[in-house]
Amino acid sequence: MKYLSEMNRMYSVSIGITTNMGVSATSWIAQNADSLDARSIWVGEDIALGQETFVLTANTLSQTKKVRVGTGIIPVTVHNIVTLARVGITLSELGDGRFAFGLGIGGIQDLERHDIKIRKPVTELRKTIQTLKRLWAGETVDSESEVFSITNFGLNLTEPLKMPIFLGVRGPQMLRLTGKIADGVILSGPFDYLKNAIKIVDDAGEEVGKEKGSIEKVIWVPTIPTFKGIKEKVARRVVALVIADTPDAVIDMLNVDIERVEKIRATVAASSPKEGAEHVDDELLDVFSISGTREHMVDRFEALEKIGATEVVIGPPFSGDWRGATTEIFEEVRMRMRES
């Protein structure tokens, strides 16, 4: 079999999993990712739900041989910075160069649900990344922020640790920060927003001397293959949650029914995404997700490539015959790569 990575292509296809998925599902993905020819498996953390994040990431690394495995993302607001530094060492060694550390502040809904408030999120993320980089460089560090404080701490490394750092961010200031200090960005949102976000990241990278296009752009939006049994109401429920978690700065960029968006947000906040889904129409479904037939979904992947995406992530949600759907989507991508 000739793998996609050996072909002339501009974007890669990966698979996303979250801690709230069952072990049988995450293990199937890990055990089949190499043969599917996925570029990466990204592990998203649902705060305080399901499997332990770093155990799941380590298990995924141990079940794969070729694919990159990354966290996408770890909220720095809920983990001790010393733990994060040590996790980086452990997973980097376990993955033998295949681990990527994806970090961020955390989703709006998750942070509010756990009563976590950060006054200056951009400053917090910047300080965290700077401190982690210094620790991995072998320095003994004094540093503090809103959520951490360390004094005279070092990791006693025999040599500097190097691994790619990805940031999961949304707002303009966060995007500029990512372009300047990270190796890649994990983005989610509507196409119009993504196009603008990619430009902000690239421009910021060039400002600090990075080569044009050198920053990886990973796009992770809900992918909902309705051609294999996943019900459309599941898709609408997912989109309702996404809309509720989307910042105003992103919504303001879109040509959508703002009154409907606010109704969805209010309903999700007052009850649940299930009730909010009743207000998600076809337009919003198409704006905030990639769904439909495998051909249509891969068409959307290719559209993302045209606006600068280097990697597109499949899933979650996983429902219906998602194993068959995932396999067919990768088959469609391979077929198009061969024909191009």
Give names to the regions the model predicted:
Residues 31-35, 57-68, 88-99, 179, ...:
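Acidic (Asp/Glu)-rich catalytic clusters
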Residues 11-17, 41-43, 69-72, 99-103, ...:
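Hydrophobic faces of well-ordered beta-strands that scaffold small-molecule active sites
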Residues 2-9, 119-154, 196-306:
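An alpha-helical appendage that flanks or caps ligand/catalytic pockets
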Residues 11-24, 74-81, 159-170, 223-224, ...:
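Active-site mouth loops of central-metabolism enzymes
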